[in-house]
Amino acid sequence: MAKFQFEGIDTYIKQLNELQAATKAGVVGKTVYAGAEVVADAVRRAIQALPVGDGRARDGLISTVTLPQKAGLLDGFGISPMDDEDGFMNVKLGFDGYNATRTKKYPRGQPNVLIARSVNSGTTFRKKTKFVDKAVNSSKKAAEAAMDAACSREIEKIMK
């Protein structure tokens, strides 16, 4: 009868078990955050590229943001903590907080999410400037590449 002898199979099985155990928290988490960072950087550059004005309409719709609005968007933009939704690991990019423009209606300052939505989607008095949509679409391939590199790097660490 023939006899087969495998060397290193126990080590390989151990590595696969470690990979499975580290997948959710380590590999997937670092991969998702790597892609989110690339997209977040693109959105930050898009916010910095928004034209600045005094916030008053001249001959039509407002097409600018004020300096406090722009600063509020930059300060309030961020990445949420990772969330597990039925096995799908997600992070969200978004705006939080208030800017320094205080009004009677907004005594704490204008909500950054309100300004971001009105600039991105437009209103009856503001021209549409799709800065978030353009940034997300333009950074999609770079985000996928960053995620692929991060995933490979994390798997390589475990499989050594």
Features from the language model and the residues they span:
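Charged, well-structured alpha/beta interaction segments
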Residues: 20-53
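Charged, low-complexity interaction tracts
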Residues: 2-3, 41, 45-160
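N-terminal, Lys/Arg- and Ser/Thr-rich interaction peptides
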Residues: 1-25
